[in-house]
Amino acid sequence: MSGNLLAKWIIGKAEKSEAYRAGTLTGMKHPKPDREMIKAAGGLPELIRQADELEKSGYIRTEKSNLGADMKKIYYSIDVIPKLCEKEGIEDPRKQQLRYIKQIEQLRAEVQGSFLEGYYDEIIRRLELGEIVKSPDMEDVDFFRCLNAVVNLKKSLWMRVFSAAVLNDSKRFKKDYEKKGDGMERSASV
C-alpha cells in the first residue's frame, strides 16, 4: 500500500464527519491510538513510524511514552486535513462537497421554474448540511443529463430515441436510468 496509512486514517475520519464536510468543524483533534488506528496503520511500530514522519513534516504532534515505544495521543488541527489530502492525492471531503453543490446549482439553473428545481433544492440542502448523498449518485453525470433533458423535451419521444439523443446509446436509458427516476418523483413532491 502506498502513502501514509495514518494520514489516510485521519482523512477517513474527516470524510465520515458531516460537520467537516459542511465546513463547521474547527479546532484540534486528539485521538488516542486504538485498535482501529493501529490496524489501519499496519501495526504499532508502523503507526509510530508514520506518526514520526507526519510530525517531522509538521502535520501532527504526538505524545509518546515508554521511551518512544508507545503512543498516548496524536494531536492535529482540522486545518491540516486539506494539506494531508493534497499530500496523499485524495480529494478533500469538504472540497468534494462544495464541488457537488456547485454542480447541482448549475443543473438547477438549467431547469429553473420546473418541477426539478425543488428536487435540486433538496439535494443542495442535504449537501450543505454535510450529508453524503448516495441517491442519486453525485458522480453520475449522465443521470442528471437525462433529468434535465426530460424537462426540456418539446414533444414526446420514444424511450430509445431519447436515450440515443441524450446518451448516444439507444438502450442505455432503459438499462441504467429508467428505475432511478422513481425516487426522484417522491423527493420533488416534498
Regions found by a protein language model. Name each.
Residues 1-190:
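Nucleic-acid enzyme cleavage-core boundary/entry regions
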